[in-house]
C-alpha cells in the first residue's frame, strides 16, 4: 500500500509528468515536499546573509580606519634617555670627587680622619675654616674696614694746613732737582710751590721790589724769591740805564728777561744832538742829554737826509718814553716822544725837513733799516 518514495536527491528535480505510476495527488505532494526541503536546505545561508547586509558599511569603515595612518606619540628614543642618565652620573661623580678633594685640605682638628662627612657637613666645615684663616691674616671685612679708616686718618694728619687742596709734604720732594738745589742753598720754603701762602698787599709788595720794571710779574709765593728777582733787586741799586750815546761797551739790556750783551756806540754825540734837535716836540720841554734815558725795546734806524752826504745814525723807538728817576720826579716832568701815526699822506713829519712820502721811504736814497 505504501509505495516507496523516490530518493531525496531526485525530489524537486524531476518534473511531475516524468514519474510513471504516480497519481496526480501524490505527484503534487511530492513536489511540495521537494520545495520545502529545498527551502530548509538553503535556510542557514539566508539566515546568515540577511543580517550581514546592513552591517556592510560598518565593516568598510573598520577597514578604512585600520588602513588610515594613526597619529601616535613618538616614543622616547633609547639613546637620548641613556645620554641623560650618563650626564647625571657624570655630574654626581664630579661633585663627589670635588668634595673628597676639599676634605683633604681640612685639618684633623676640624674633620677627623676616620670620620665620614656628608656633602653639607663638608661644606660647612670648609666655610668655618676659611673664615678662621681670614681672621688670622686680617683679610676679613672688619679688618679691611679698620685698615682703610686708619690709612685715611694718617693721610689727613699729614696734609699741609695752609694748602687749600690738601697737598702732602711728600709732593715737595717730587718736584725735581731745581727744588732740591734751592732747598740746599738755604732758601726757606714755607709750603710747596702750589701753595701761595698768605697774600700780601700790593703796597708792601711794591716796597719789597722797588725800582723794578713795572712789567715784571711779582713772585707767586711771597716766601720764595727766585734768583731772577734777586738779580733785579741788585740791579735796582745800581746806576740807572743811560742813553745809547753815553753807554760803555758792555751794558745791561732794558728788558729784565734778556741777558747781558754788547751795546756799541753807533754815532758821535754831536750828530745825535742834531737828530734830537730836529725832532718836533710840542709844548713839553726838549730832551736833555744829561738826564737818563730808558727806552724799552729800541730799534736803531739810519737816517740819511738828502742834503748831507755822510749817513747819520740814531736810535728811534716806536713807543719811546723818557722816564725820570725817583729823585728827579718833582723837578723834571716825563718827556714823551711822539709816536709815528698814520696820516692821510702816510708820511713821517719832522720839524727840520719836508714831509717824507711813502715813495721816498721805499726808495733806495733814504736807506732806512729797521
UniProtKB/Swiss-Prot annotation:
Annotated ranges, domain bHLH: 79-133
Sequence ranges of Low complexity compositional bias: 57-77
Residue ranges, annotated region (May contain a degradation domain): 326-330
SUPFAM superfamilies in alphabetical order: HLH, helix-loop-helix DNA-binding domain
Domain of life per record: Eukaryota
Gene Ontology molecular function terms on file: DNA-binding transcription activator activity, RNA polymerase II-specific; DNA-binding transcription factor activity; protein dimerization activity; RNA polymerase II cis-regulatory region sequence-specific DNA binding
Main location: nucleus
Region Disordered, residue ranges: 51-89, 231-265, 325-350
Record's comment on post-translational modification: Degraded by the proteasome. Phosphorylated.
Induction (UniProt): Down-regulated in NOTCH1, DLL1, RBPJ and FOXC1/FOXC2 mutant mice. Expression in the anterior presomitic mesoderm is periodic, dissipating once the segmental border is established. Negatively regulated by RIPPLY2. Positively regulated by TBX6 and Notch signaling.
Keyword set, alphabetical order: Developmental protein, DNA-binding, Notch signaling pathway, Nucleus, Phosphoprotein, Transcription, Transcription regulation
GO biological process entries: mesodermal cell migration; Notch signaling pathway; positive regulation of transcription by RNA polymerase II; signal transduction involved in regulation of gene expression; somite rostral/caudal axis specification; somitogenesis
PANTHER family (UniProt xref): IP14615P, MESODERM POSTERIOR PROTEIN 2
Protein name: Mesoderm posterior protein 2
Species per Swiss-Prot/TrEMBL record: Mus musculus
Classification lineage: Eukaryota, Metazoa, Chordata, Craniata, Vertebrata
